[in-house]
């Protein structure tokens, strides 16, 4: 479900492909509901080893992150700190990952490329950038850690299935049409760079 509340665009799981149609690159959204941390080794297990994720992320969100967790009593946990890790490390797995899992929202640090663009366009998903630098504050948006799976991987790689409230801000970097904000910005940057370089060369031509 997608709602606009107090000027915020809020995605609440379960999220449909239809919910994402009006969301474009550069938009800022927030997430309510189910989000699972999922990074390098979990992607490898699913894509390379053919192992099914023990957490159902269909129509939900994953977060490329390695959080710090505090164990509590009765097999409960508290999120202490959670910041994004570089999404590009998952790029070679992401098409198959989205295809197999049906995940709708991928959250991480930095941009992604063709595999993720194609997955978002074909299967109706988006990639969002989560601003780094406030990992302790961001942990407060995690209301509960519901489940912890693949604990044999250690704390950073465990699948921490969380319930979140207005998790964000999330900047949409790839939308459900496959448009890529980072790649478009590179084109604009290079146009300006070439013009600026030409002007500088005119002004310092006497150095030759």
Per-segment meaning from a language model:
Residues 5-15:
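Short, structured beta-strand/loop micro-motifs enriched in basic residues and often containing a Trp
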Residues 16, 36, 68-70, 177-179:
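Short, glycine-/Ser/Thr-/acidic-enriched flexible segments
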Residues 23-24:
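Short, well-ordered loop/turn sites that connect or cap secondary structure elements
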Residues 37-169:
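Feature captures the catalytic cores and cofactor-binding loops of soluble hydro-lyases/lyases
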Residues 140-208:
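C-terminal binding/interaction regions
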């Amino acid at each position: 479900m997608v709602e606009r509340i107090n000027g915020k665009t809020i995605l609440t799981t379960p999220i449909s492909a239809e919910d994402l149609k009006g969301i474009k690159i550069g938009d800022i959204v927030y997430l309510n509901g189910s989000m699972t941390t999922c990074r390098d080794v979990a992607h490898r297990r699913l894509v390379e080893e053919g192992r099914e994720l023990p957490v159902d992320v269909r129509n939900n969100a994953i977060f490329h992150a390695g959080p710090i967790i505090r164990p509590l009593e009765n097999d409960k946990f508290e999120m202490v700190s959670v910041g994004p890790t570089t999404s590009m490390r998952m790029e070679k797995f992401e098409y198959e990952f989205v295809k197999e899992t049906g995940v709708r929202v991928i959250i991480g640090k930095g941009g992604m490329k063709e595999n993720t663009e194609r997955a978002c366009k074909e299967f109706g998903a988006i990639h969002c950038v989560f601003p780094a630098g406030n990992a302790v504050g961001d942990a407060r948006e995690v209301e509960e850690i519901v489940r912890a799976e693949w604990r044999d991987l250690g704390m950073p790689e465990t699948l921490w299935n969380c319930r979140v409230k207005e998790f964000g801000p999330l900047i949409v970097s790839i939308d459900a049409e496959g448009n890529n904000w980072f790649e478009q910005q590179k084109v604009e940057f290079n146009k300006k760079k070439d013009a600026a370089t030409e002007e500088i060369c005119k002004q310092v031509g006497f150095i030759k």
